C-alpha cells in the first residue's frame, strides 16, 4: 500500500542500503559548446569557422562520454543588452539519419544548421552547438539509404584525431 520511495525510505532508516551512489551515475543528456564573442561578428565567413570549432569540441566531448548523438542544434544570437542595435536570435536543429560521434558528420550538420539562421546586418554576440538524443557508442544502427563507411575506420580515425588534438598540435577542419 506504500509507494516504492516510501518503502525504500523505511528500509534505509532501518539501516538497509537500497541504492548505491554509483548506481545513479547517468551519462549526460546533452552537450553544449558555446561562447560569447569578445568582438561582435557580423560576417558569415567569420562565423563559420567559429561554429565549426564548437562542433569539433562538442564531438570530442561526445566521444569522451562514449556516446553518439542523433540531433545537432546550432544557435546564434545578438546581445540582448545592446538595445540600440537590431536583435536576432535563432536556433536550427538537424536530425541525423543514424546516431554518430564522427566529427565530419557533426560538422556537416552544424554547417547545414548555420546557413539558414544567419542574417546579414546583425552583430552576433554568441553562437553555439548543442548535441542531444544520445545513444551508447556501441549500439550500431545503419541506414537503408546510406552506404555505411567502414565504422571501424571511422572510429579509429576519430580516436587518432582526438589524440592529436590532445597534444600541442591541433587539427583544423576546412569549413
Indicate residue ranges for each PLM-predicted region.
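DNA-contacting surface of Y-family translesion DNA polymerases
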Residues: 1-123, 139
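Acidic, metal-coordinating catalytic segment for phosphate/diphosphate chemistry
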Residues: 88, 96-175
